[in-house]
């Protein structure tokens, strides 16, 4: 679906409604769990999130899609130029019309988008990470940025100024928590996709962590599941869950109409870690996923948490 044009003008005119519908279809097709969460949002916010998701997906496809072998640093530079065009109000592709409209409705900053492109540059130049600090930077760029983009759309809760003790209270903007949720999701993706990435010669788990458990790159590339691997995965899952816990702390600061979908998305994605454990950490031969019935059961619990937490 990704098309890069050197033309400064959109080749195929699209209406806003058509563009948003295209973004909806792409989100529903490629991010089923995420899409379920967006269905709980007010219309304007869900449309904006679809537009952001599609841009992020197209960006990711540059280095992780069917045409990735032809992507160069120059390709990413050109993609960033197209981003600047979109922020200037000039869409290039039909799906960009929705993003341009979103930029007019919500206070989105261009920097997280640029940071995401920087994350794709990292993917072009390396396939190993020595330390968690290195991996954490990568996770911020490719996923923590999504938290920041989404936060601008979701909005924050305003204190009830009719209550005297709230009159001096400032609005809390849960930036760190939004980043934490993006990082938690990316760490979950990495753990779920270890086998798939290994088949492409990529290892995202920090090499320092592998060494800590006496587990080698060769072991990972060969899909070796033993007690060393299980201990390593327990360590990684515990780390990811800490980021989810941090993210939870910011949900109460969000606008009330967005808390239920955010709780839903967080809880559903975190359950992937439970499924990895249920599969006895074999991410080489089994892809962890949350069954539909579990997703449905999650909805009322997420709604309850949104109301009381």
UniProtKB/Swiss-Prot annotation:
A single MF term (Gene Ontology): geranylgeranyl diphosphate synthase activity
A Pfam family per the record: SQS_PSY
Top EC class of this enzyme: transferase
Keyword set, alphabetical order: Carotenoid biosynthesis, Multifunctional enzyme, Transferase
Pathway assigned in UniProt: Carotenoid biosynthesis; phytoene biosynthesis; all-trans-phytoene from geranylgeranyl diphosphate: step 1/1
SUPFAM superfamilies membership: Terpenoid synthases
Keyword Transferase among record annotations: yes
Any one GO BP annotation for this protein: carotenoid biosynthetic process
InterPro entries found in the cross-reference section: Isoprenoid_synthase_dom_sf, PhytoSynCyanob, Squ/phyt_synthse, Squalene/phytoene_synthase_CS, Trans_IPPS_bact-type, Trans_IPPS_HH
Catalytic reactions of this protein: 2 (2E,6E,10E)-geranylgeranyl diphosphate = 15-cis-phytoene + 2 diphosphate
Enzyme Commission number: 2.5.1.32
Gene3D superfamilies per the UniProt record, alphabetical: Farnesyl Diphosphate Synthase (1.10.600.10)
Described function: Catalyzes the reaction from prephytoene diphosphate to phytoene.
Family: Belongs to the phytoene/squalene synthase family.
Protein's recorded name: Phytoene synthase
Organism whose genome encodes this protein: Arthrospira platensis (Spirulina platensis)
